[in-house]
Design a protein with these regions (language model features):
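Short amphipathic alpha-helix that is part of the acyltransferase structural core
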Residues: 1-37
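Active-site rim helix/loop that mediates acceptor-substrate recognition in acyltransferases
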Residues: 28-52, 56
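Conserved beta-strand in the GNAT
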Residues: 53, 59-68, 74-79
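A short, internal acetyl-CoA/4′-phosphopantetheine-binding micro-motif in the GNAT/acyltransferase core
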Residues: 77-86, 110-113
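Conserved acetyl-CoA-binding loop-helix of GNAT-fold acetyltransferases
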Residues: 86-99, 122-124
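Conserved GNAT acetyl-CoA-binding A-motif
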Residues: 99-117
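Conserved active-site alpha-helix within GNAT-family acetyltransferase domains
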Residues: 111-138
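Short glycine/proline-centered loop/turn elements that form peptide/ligand docking sites
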Residues: 123-125, 141-149
Length: 157
């Protein structure tokens, strides 16, 4: 599959729902967005967003990434349908995100105790991000009742 990546500042309602379903299928169940309103609330808290949608050959959204500003620093979130894993598409998507900035920060779950909605163990993507040039800031963590994650950072050399 040769994916097509489309970049846009806002998502349509249909796109949001597709992304929300991918989110709920691929991320740990504890951080799911149960309703479209939950996903809208998440997005509305972010500023200066740019969305990157990965479409397959049937023009179906199979992945999504987003860059946004937090405290004047560029952050990102990214999720791919499991059918796209280990095909280079995630790396291609990251390359697209990196092409418009000199720095990116993100939160990554770094343990293997979480379960996805289908009951499978969630595989931490830390190694994927390290392979793609990110550094793990082990001393900076996000610890809440629903998520435990480590900060990752990429800087243009």
């Amino acid at each position: 599959m040769i994916p097509k990546i489309f970049i846009q500042s806002e998502l349509t309602s249909e796109q949001k729902e597709t992304v929300r379903l991918i989110w709920n299928n691929e991320y740990p169940e504890r951080i799911k967005k149960a309703t479209p309103a939950d996903f809208d609330t998440y997005l509305e808290q972010l500023s200066h967003t740019t969305h990157f949608l990965v479409y397959d050959e049937s023009h179906i959204i199979r992945g999504w990434a987003m860059t946004f500003q937090r405290d004047e620093t560029p952050w990102f979130a990214m999720i791919l349908d499991a059918s796209l894993h280990r095909k280079g598409i995630g790396s291609q998507l990251l390359h697209t995100l990196k092409s418009s900035t000199s720095r990116l920060l993100g939160w990554v779950i770094d343990h293997t105790t979480e379960r996805k909605a289908n009951g499978e163990l969630y595989t931490s993507p830390v190694d994927f991000y390290v392979k793609n040039g990110f550094a793990v800031n082990a001393e900076i963590r996000l610890e809440t009742p629903i998520i435990s994650a480590v900060q990752i950072e990429w800087r243009e050399i």
